Regions:
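Right-handed parallel beta-helix/beta-solenoid
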Residues: 32-69, 86, 105
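All-beta strand scaffolds that present successive hydrophobic residues in beta-strands
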Residues: 12-15, 82, 100-103, 130-136, ...
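Right-handed parallel beta-helix/beta-spiral solenoid domain characteristic of secreted/periplasmic
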Residues: 99-149
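Surface-exposed, glycine- and small/polar-enriched segments that build interaction surfaces at terminal
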Residues: 138-154, 172-180
């Protein structure tokens, strides 16, 4: 979690803490008052084939339609939970720092690219992110442009707490293309 130190008008620092447990916080000439250092779980954003991207997606009975919309809503500590189904998404799907993308189960969630994005990377990962329990399929690796990977790290990739995790994911490409 990120904690802002100071008031809105006089914010002088931001700190990232995880799993902090303390009875006493001792500092030199700093007064910390009313700070909650208890790490709380983030929000869950739900995605389903019958969802609606105009909805907030914060309840299992009111999901968004696209994974991209779920990712746009999510922030550090949040989870994008994907119900079973076949999803067609514009690749790449950008996973923000600290966000978990979790499919219902490995074979029940299938993600394929929309027309025109088949040679793009499927997922671009930031630090501390996770993708798990899903299948990515029907895209091409393009050896000429070096694109079309299942997973790639973002250009400005940084690790704060841990590196990205990719677990229980099946990647099925349609083959390889060559371009200049």
């Amino acid at each position: 979690n990120t904690y802002n130190i100071g008031t809105d008008a006089k914010r002088w620092a931001t700190g990232n803490f995880a799993n902090v447990t303390t009875n006493t916080l001792t500092t030199n000439d700093l007064d910390f008052g009313n700070i909650n250092l208890i790490s709380t779980p983030g929000n869950i954003y739900y995605v389903a084939t019958n969802g609606n991207d105009a909805r907030p997606g914060e309840h299992p009975q009111d999901p968004v339609r696209t994974i991209a919309q779920g990712l746009s809503l999510a922030g550090v500590g949040d989870t994008v939970y994907i119900y079973p189904g076949q999803y067609q998404e514009a690749f790449p799907l950008n996973v923000p720092m600290g966000v978990t993308v979790k499919g219902h189960s490995l074979r029940s969630v299938e993600i394929s690219p929309t027309s025109g994005t088949q040679s793009n990377d499927a997922f671009v990962m930031q630090g501390d992110s996770t993708v798990e329990d899903l299948t990515v399929k029907d895209f091409f690796y393009n050896s000429g442009s070096n694109t079309g990977y299942g997973f790639r790290f973002a250009n400005n990739f940084r690790v704060y707490l841990r590196s990205p995790y990719i677990r229980n994911v099946t990647v099925i490409t349609k083959g390889t293309t060559t371009s200049n």
